[in-house]
Amino acid sequence: MKCLFGFLFIMLVAFLQDVHGVDSCIGKPCKVKGEDMKDIKEKKIEDIKEEIKNVKKEIFEDVDDELLDDNIRDDKIRDAKPSLRRVHWTRIRPGIPAVIKIGSSIGKK
C-alpha cells in the first residue's frame, strides 16, 4: 500500500513539473518553459532600461515645451538675479532627473 502511494506521489510531482514546464533544478540552472532564469532576468533588465530611457525623453520633452510656452529664454534667465539662474532638480524615480523649478527659494535660509 505504501508503495502505491509513493508511486502516485512521484507521478503527481512529475505531472506537475511537466504541466508548468519546469525542469528539474537539481545540479543545473532552473528553466521555465525552456528558457534559463538568467536569460529571463537579463531580458527584464533590458526592458527596464529601455523604459527608463523613454521616460527620460518624455520628461525632457515636456520640460522643453513648458519652457517655450512660458516664453522663458536663455537671455532672460541670464539677465535675471543670480538666484533666478539656478535650476533645481529632483528625482521622480531613481536615476531619472527632471527640472522642477527655475529660480526658486530652495536652499535659501
Swiss-Prot record:
Expressed in the ectodermal epithelium. The keyword Thylakoid does not apply. Residues 1-21 form the signal peptide. It is found in: Secreted; Target cell membrane. Keywords: Amidation, Antibiotic, Antimicrobial, Immunity, Innate immunity, Membrane, Secreted, Signal, Target cell membrane, Target membrane. GO terms for cellular component: extracellular region. It comes from the Eukaryota. The modification Isoleucine amide is found at I106. Residues 22-77 form a propeptide. The keyword Zinc does not apply. Belongs to the arminin family. Antimicrobial peptide with a broad-spectrum antimicrobial activity. Keeps its antibacterial activity under a wide range of salt concentrations that mimic physiological conditions of human blood, which is surprising, since Hydra is an obligate freshwater animal with nearly no salt tolerance. Does not affect red blood cells. This is Arminin 6560.
